Amino acid sequence: MKLWLPLLLLTFPRFVLAQVDPAPAERFVRQYAAHYRVSPELVAALIDVESRWNPRAVSGKGAMGLMQLMPATARRFGAFKPFDVEQNIAAGTRYVTALMWEFHGDLRLVAAAYYAGDHGIAREQLNYHNPDVVAYVLTVRRQFMIRKYAAMRPLRRSTP
């Protein structure tokens, strides 16, 4: 067996390994965003940043699927099969909606809580100093703005 192949697979960008037809995912984003009354551009921006639309993405910390849900969060919001595109988007969108309520629609806090967990962000509000959280919030915000002001584009692949 060639030893370089497993190494290549480990180092190859994960979003290149499992590209699928985006149409169902886009449809589910629109459907669940409308159902939970949250911006589809926000949900799509989170997917852009979290998994780059790879439904089989797994983070180093164990987050799974398009919206990179941690196992407990996935179960809490109804995704018992976190790699199932519809379940992942439904649960992730429901989680975003809960965060929107908790943080009174402040997208900065919603993005920070999505990334770092809602408990710490609820305590710190905008006083968080973790550079990873700050960078994540700025990246999600940028993707959201790109999508919001370019609504004619499909939900997938808005990366400039």
Please describe what each predicted stretch is.
Residues 1-3:
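Positively charged n-region of N-terminal signal peptides that target proteins for export
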Residues 5-6, 16:
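Cleavable N-terminal signal peptides
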